[in-house]
């Protein structure tokens, strides 16, 4: 996690019966999120160090046995910026904005990764240009039945945010003002 300048860089393997650490898997600096897919792979995001180590997404196969760590990049070798991520079926949706002190610029993406092939399908699933109005993509969820994509825009992190809803095709369906830093979602269903 965030321990500047000596960032931790490992995922711990814990025996659930004894709750003892059995090992550590080196991944990258400043780890942030961890998800498991339906095939037992772990997906880990790194925030990088805001200088030379960029934010990135990693896949760990066989985490309890002989773990292999793969950095997930686009076809041209570019890292995905990952502030938050969520799974729906074989698709991992990732959002993020990364600031670099080296370039003094932000880099933003709205990616989809096929978790079976570990291939980046797109770095911008928003297809209607609405991404230009999102200041700070912070939270993401995908409706399990409709495939609608929800993005929480934290904007300035001190003022009200915005919740955007996109169709599975990446078209804006609606948006609404929220409280500060919209990041988490829950779906309730009628019985």
Residue locations for each model-derived region?
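Predominantly soluble domains enriched in secretory-pathway, periplasmic, or organellar proteins
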Residues: 1-191
